[in-house]
A protein has these predicted regions:
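N-terminal binding-site loop/beta-alpha segment at the start of enzyme catalytic domains
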Residues: 1-71, 357-389
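A cross-family glycoside hydrolase active-site/sugar-binding cleft signature
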Residues: 5-9, 47-49, 74-76, 109-112, ...
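Conserved, mostly hydrophobic/aromatic
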Residues: 6, 38, 46, 59, ...
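Glycine/proline-rich, positively charged
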Residues: 15-26, 36, 82-183, 187-199, ...
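Structured C-terminal cap/extension of enzyme domains
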Residues: 36-39, 181-389
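Short beta->alpha linker loops
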Residues: 50, 54, 78, 150-151, ...
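Alpha-helix-loop-beta-strand connector modules within alpha/beta enzyme cores
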Residues: 56-75, 129-140, 195
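Short hydrophobic/aromatic-enriched beta-strand-loop microsegments
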Residues: 70-73, 164-172, 259-265
């Protein structure tokens, strides 16, 4: 497994599943250049998904033209209640990728988006989606089976501890390390660990704040985050979503600096942590997460843990672009990004109703004002998931 995986959710022409005659030559020419550079640089792993619009179809038309004997092909299919529907989607992916024509298989098949216990049940129940995947595996049409997840830590651990999967795709970056126990659990089971979208979900590092650029110097924030992630025990590969060949450049710089990670990372980490402490204080950093109800148990389904995390990122490192995108997605992300933002406060949710569920939080008195400031700074823009846009 290479250190970087070429992610297939940035290079495609469209997020809608366009027919082949509508795929433009310019889009295919761009993708071919990306594939050729990826092969030349050792990015042998390609990761796409059934619902990445035209991604699978475009890849299927080009993989035979850009040969790579070391290629590892991964696609992802979401779990559903009806396993026949799951198998139909799997067949469609294999067809779009034109595997039979090349005598190839899906090397890595992910059950895509096990984000709650209901979806885990659809996957694991007798006769469910996992059994379909395992049948394809026994027939030689699938190599290894894993899962991708945006779930809460407890649910990720539950899925890992089933011992049903060979690898996991999850979120873990410098700005978000709460899934560390999941990585440890995966290591204990000799599972592969794939980090999802470290550049985008790691803080919009493609458009970093001036503050973050200053704190990460002399490295670009992308390079710093890549080095941090790749230096972590148990992390095997990072997704690199490229819209053009040059999008590989900073990530390849990180690879070249990996032997110096122990020298380069500590001073940057010290500056980042000092900035957090100066902006927020140790009391907040040590205790802000304590006593917060989960979003289903909060009036208006306000996702307090996530919103207060965004507040911390905003105050410490000015991650406004990232914060605005995450804030706007709350309420529109379904099980991929559950809960709601603070817009309901003072509207359908009163301060008294909110305080009633914050009895165990040491910051109960401050939280309503924090949410109002966050709403003022980040609100006003509804955001949809890329597939919805």
């Amino acid at each position: 497994m290479p250190l970087f995986s070429l992610g297939g959710m940035r290079f495609q022409q469209s997020w809608t599943d366009v027919p082949p005659e509508q795929i433009e030559a310019a889009s295919q020419d761009n993708l071919r250049r990306i594939l050729e550079r990826a092969v030349a640089c050792g990015l042998h792993h390609i990761e796409t998904a059934r619902y990445y619009g035209s991604s699978e179809r475009q890849l299927g038309d080009l993989l035979g033209l850009v040969p790579d004997p070391a290629r590892i092909l991964q696609t992802k299919i979401p779990p559903v209640q009806d396993p026949a529907q799951f198998e139909q989607e799997l067949s469609t992916s294999a067809e779009r990728l034109r595997l039979a024509e090349r005598g190839e298989r899906i090397d890595l098949l992910s059950i895509h988006g096990i984000n709650n216990r209901e979806l885990l049940e659809h996957t694991l129940r007798p006769g469910g989606c996992l059994e379909v995947a395992q049948r394809w595996q026994s027939e030689g049409r699938v190599g290894h089976i894993g899962f991708s997840t945006h779930a809460a830590l407890s649910e990720i651990l539950e899925a890992i501890e089933t011992d049903a999967f060979s690898y996991v795709n999850l979120h873990w970056y410098y700005i978000r390390q709460d899934n560390s126990p999941a990585i440890a659990a995966a290591i204990a089971r000799d599972m592969g660990v794939f980090l999802i979208s470290p550049t985008d979900k790691g803080g919009h590092l493609h458009t970093p704040s001036a503050r973050l650029l200053e704190l990460c110097a002399p490295l670009h924030p992308i390079v710093f985050n890549d080095l941090f992630c790749l230096s972590a025990p148990g992390v095997h590969t990072l997704s690199l979503g490229a819209a053009r060949p040059s999008d590989l450049d900073l990530h390849l710089e990180a690879v070249s600096l990996l032997p110096r990670a122990a020298e380069l990372l500590p001073p940057i980490q010290q500056r980042l942590e000092a900035a957090r402490r100066q902006a927020l204080g140790d009391d907040w950093l040590n205790t802000w997460h304590q006593g917060l109800p989960d979003w289903p148990d909060t009036p208006g389904q306000i996702n307090l843990p996530l919103l207060l995390w965004l507040h911390t990122l905003l105050e410490a490192w000015d991650l406004e672009s990232f914060g605005r995108a995450r804030y706007g997605l709350l309420g529109n992300g379904g099980h991929w990004f559950p809960g709601r933002n603070a817009d309901a406060l003072d509207d359908t949710v009163s301060e008294a109703e909110l305080l009633a569920v914050l009895g165990e939080s040491p910051w109960a008195a401050e939280i309503p004002a924090i949410l109002r400031r966050l709403r003022q700074r980040l609100g006003g823009q509804m955001v949809k998931r890329l597939q919805q846009e």
